[in-house]
Regions:
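Short, glycine-/Ser/Thr-/acidic-enriched flexible segments
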Residues: 14, 69, 85, 96, ...
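PP2C/PPM family metal-dependent serine/threonine protein phosphatase catalytic domain
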Residues: 54-76, 126, 130-136, 165-197, ...
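Active-site-proximal, acidic helix/loop segment immediately C-terminal to a metal-coordinating Asp/Glu
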Residues: 94-118, 176, 181-182, 187-189, ...
Length: 271
């Protein structure tokens, strides 16, 4: 099943303790030559079914940092979470700055996260969020939508961008920008998003940034990410360094903007 093994065992209704479920997972894994998590237990009409799912090969570690252009209210919003099979990271940038931008950015990010958790694809989630922003008020509303979904069994990563700034992938220690220019959601009847599929491995990073971080272009970001990857920096530190450096550069140019970085690193899952 998409690179992962599943097993089901049905028996007369039985109660199991947590240690017993862990032991059953270990024995089932030995028989199937796979590593399983403790099973989900379903009981109905005198029968009990144990559902075993293979442990993922990877785990995701998240980090985020940000700063507002003025005051403490930022139009950027981040959501980072793991479903049973995938790591999800979302960055939305509300149009403009201040509280109106914060409302749009937060609405887009939170609604996208809920839809992904419910099983919607990125493309369909973007269409629904587009409608929500368009109906929110009579005033023009809009936000960028930037998300990456990483299969924790295979390392396959699906990237979707609508109006978002280029992101970055660090694979094998080399950083490269990802993404082209497209329109935000909420300002047109349709969604002009772009999607692509890449493959990541343990030790790789995925980075989403708002356009305020790229005031001086993407070159310095790629170099910094390669330095951080070589040092094995945790995602929280990577995000903080990017935001602090971008803020210093923005102050020199006199073009302040909301600045946000969201970072995901893949690590081997301990079995």
């Amino acid at each position: 099943d998409l690179g992962r093994a599943r097993a089901a065992v049905t028996l007369p209704r039985t109660r199991f303790s947590s240690p017993e479920l862990a032991a059953l997972a270990q024995e089932t894994g030995r028989i199937c030559r796979r590593d399983f998590d403790p099973p989900q237990v379903l009981s109905c009409k005198g029968m009990t079914t144990l559902l075993f799912c293979e442990k993922p090969a990877l785990r995701a570690v998240f980090g985020t940092a940000g700063t507002a252009a003025k005051g403490t209210v930022s139009g950027d919003a981040v959501q980072q979470f793991c479903s049973p099979a995938a790591a999800q990271m979302i960055l939305c940038d509300g149009m403009g700055t201040g509280r109106p931008a914060a409302v749009d950015g937060s609405l887009a990010a939170e609604l996208t996260a809920r839809l992904l958790k419910a099983g919607f694809t990125a493309e369909l989630a973007a269409r629904l969020v587009n409608v929500a922003l368009a109906l929110k008020s009579d005033e023009e509303s809009g936000a960028t939508l930037d998300l990456i979904s990483v299969d924790l069994y295979t390392g396959t990563a699906r990237i979707f961008k609508a109006g978002a700034a280029p992101g970055f992938l660090v694979h094998g220690g080399r950083a490269r920008p990802v993404g082209d220019i497209s329109l935000p959601i909420g300002i047109l009847g349709g969604v002009n998003g772009q999607s692509r599929v890449v493959h990541l491995a343990a030790g790789d990073y995925a980075v989403l940034v708002s356009d305020g971080l790229l005031v001086d272009g993407p070159g310095w970001v790629a170099k910094q990410l390669e330095l951080s990857a070589a040092a094995g920096d945790p995602p929280e530190k990577v995000a903080r360094i990017l935001v602090e450096t971008a803020r210093a550069r923005a102050e020199q140019t006199g073009r302040p903007d909301d600045i946000t970085a969201a970072v995901l690193r893949l690590e081997p899952c301990g079995h």
